[in-house]
Every structure is written in C-alpha cells, then in structure tokens.
Amino acid sequence: MEYEFRRNSLTGTYLASFSMDHEVLGQWFSEELGPELAKIQQVLDIIKEIQAGKRDSWRLIGGDLTLDLDEEQARIYANALGFEQEYELEESMSLYDAESEAYCGLEDLEEALLSWYEFVQKGR
C-alpha cells in the first residue's frame, strides 16, 4: 500500500493520496481525521489495545466514512454502503464500491497513521 501526503500552502489543508484499491483511505485521512492530532492518536491507541488483546474490535463512524478495526484488518467504507437498497439495480447500473471501500492490515494502517501524525505535526 503506497501513499503520499501533501499540504496546500495557500489553504493549509492536508491531503492524503493512497494507491489503487485504497483510494478511500486517502479520503478518510484527509476528511475524517484531517490535522487533528488527538483524533489520530486515539485511533493509534485503539490499534495498540486491539493488538494487545484488550479489545476485539472497534468502530469509528464519521461524517461520510466509517472505520472498522479487528484483530487482523481495518475496513474503511462509505456510510452509504451500509444501507440496504430497497430495489435491485440493473447490472450496468450497479454501484461501484471499489472507490468507496478498502481493506488493509492493521499494521499497515498503523504505519500510515504514524506517518500522517508526523506529517501533520511537522506542518504546524
């Protein structure tokens, strides 16, 4: 999983971009976490608790995206994916979930979060 972090010097916004099949992680980092060090640290602390066996799983529901953690992996997905459709769409009209959902290993997420934390901290 590859990623790149940038900061817009004019607006001060932080942006994360992740490799194909993990694009939604970039959106989650940029929009749900943003430059909030306390929120980043909270997720890192929860990961440590899961790795230590103190928790089995954890969920953080954001404005547009949700993070689910368990002992093996992280899943980030658009909140809209959690809703059941009342009717079936034709095959050609099916919703494209690949950019709305991603899975990665817990350690991979932890590594990316640590890098994001450092990047945001240096930008202050």
From Swiss-Prot:
Family annotation (InterPro entries): UPF0231 (IPR008249)
Secretion signal, residue range per the UniProt entry: none
Similarity-based family: Belongs to the UPF0231 family.
Superkingdom, natural source: Bacteria
Pfam families named in the record: UPF0231
Organism listed in the record: Shewanella sp. (strain ANA-3)
Protein name: UPF0231 protein Shewana3_0655
